[in-house]
Amino acid sequence: MINNSENVQNNSTVSPQPITQNILIDRFNPTYWRIDGPQTMSFAITNYGNGFEASFRSRMTTDLAGISWDSYDSKDHKFLAYETKYSYSGVVWDFDIELSPSMPVLNNESLTPTLTVYYNDNGVDKIAYIVLFNYANTPSSRSAHIHINWDTVKAGFSATDSFPVTNIQQITFSAFTSSYNPHSSLPLSQAEDGYIRITNSVVTGANAKLNLSRVVVPQHNYGLCTSYDDHYDLNPQRIVDNMAALGYHGFINHYCGMSHYPEIIWRSDINRFQIPDTLVTGQDVINPCTRKWHEKYAQALHNANMQPVFGVSFEMYSLGANEFWAQRDWNSNLGKTGYQPPSYFFSLSDQNALAYLHKVFIEFADTMVTGGCDVNMQIGEPWWWYNTDTNLPCVYNYPTKLAFNADTGLYAPDLGTIYEAMNKTGTPYDEFKTWLRNKLGQTCQDIRTAIKAKYANAQVCPLIFFPSIRSPIQTLATYINYPSEHYSYPHFDYIMTEAYDWLLEAKLDLAHQAVSQIPTQDLGYPASKVAYLSGFVPDASIAYIYGFDKNKPYRTPIWQRIFGDMQNNVSLGLMKQFIWAYPQVMFDSITIDTTQAPNGFFVENTLYTPISDNTPYPPDIYL
């Protein structure tokens, strides 16, 4: 048994440490603002001139987004974060603001735009509202120069309320349209778009500057994964700057998410939001804020000599789901994930659902081109789902049963659970299982064809999850989710692979065996056309799913195996190994320094050695 302390290279005077330097930035630097709001809204914060633009789409009368500066940087790696300064005393802030025509004018009496200040006063959290028109040179307009002296600024409509500025946690601009009504939550007759632009920010006086930490490392060969659902609130430039500083270059794997990109439209006939039926209406399926964010992300990646791979899954977020398009089990129960709220899965036999999915891929490909990047798309992970609480496969929605009958003349049989299905043989069981497998493979090939029809030079790959196709017990899921003939080279330009379950079970031999054999020997890909995602470290909220105690130091032992896993695969000559994922690298302050520590990695200041075998996890980190 190896415990953590045996794998730590002690922080002594001779032990290497990350090399860092500090640079000075202005407080309220435009790259470090965030945006967030309710799930019914869409929003994005991106570069605009010498400042930022916060764009948003409101769909409810109560929709309001917050554009925030945090005094404490909780989003960045320890050696990439800006200095924490809660005191705003001595700070004078000048900036230009521009509100969209859909927003109220600055001195609107009932909906006056404000800067909300969250502060602490003698241990009590309080809120003050700075009414912006009181500090504007043109208070009756939507464009103005704002001058705020934090030593004298006052809150309230008439600027009469003093408040302390020595312990401010956060300041927030509010983004809303003139239809905003906090007392009546109703869907708008149609979505309303808006923006707030902050430019020409100048900060003077004491406390005007902040130290920004910058780790100094050479470039290395590992890639990194990002995800829109994790980073929708950040300026994409911030993410790219951080990755470049940490030595990442070349390919970056980006999951386009499933909960924030969809355009959703209020359907009064069913009294809920729903994604559009683009086969019927021709409407865009990605909301304009997501489109802008990804265009700016692609542009920033391109400028930093990085090439994104944009991945789209088969998941459908429940908030706007069209449940007629979803996979279902024999009892018509929806296939759904265990998250709250859950996501569902697009049926592979519903033509309207597939048209929607094709358009998602095409619209994300469009953003790559707008940003100056080559089109490179990852399909999936593609699969037929099964519900883990019942082990029932979700292969029975009506279009699937109809398509099977049309193709074979047979009726879809009850396969039972994913385990029972393997003991049911003969007609129509064998035909149904084979048909399901081929349907998945053909669906992926059809997506590839749709992308290449518009972008002939596009690179397209499927993502396969090794534990789902190689398990000790063969199940229906392992069979139908591995259409090897359809996935084989050269049907796709390359293949993306992953095996995180085995790393979390300390079965690194299985992961290495799979990545070294399945893509090349089974599917015929050259090693140089095999990419691999290594990870991940579960967040505290889901650590229990994998048996870890969130209150114990479980994270570093997992990192040791992630790096050991990748170390095992170096000799294979793979196209790229990606670390899954950016939020965990930021949270744990993971640094790769091939000069200071060619055989290890840093967690903050501490150097660790990888574990590349099946050494069990320390027993004290389990529940």
What are these regions (language model features)?
Residues 224-230, 273-288, 341-356, 429-440, ...:
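The substrate-binding groove and active-site-proximal loops of carbohydrate-active enzymes
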Residues 75-115, 172-173, 201, 602, ...:
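Extra-cytoplasmic beta-strand recognition segments
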Residues 169, 175-178, 248-262, 313-317, ...:
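Substrate-binding cleft of secreted/luminal carbohydrate-active enzymes
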Residues 95, 146-195:
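Extracellular beta-strand ligand-recognition surfaces/modules
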Residues 221, 227-278, 282-285, 296, ...:
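Catalytic domains of carbohydrate-active enzymes, especially glycoside hydrolases
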Residues 178-213, 594-600, 604-606:
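Exposed low-complexity, polar/acidic, P/S/T/G-rich flexible segments that act as propeptides
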Residues 53-75, 98-156:
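Extracellular ligand-binding interfaces
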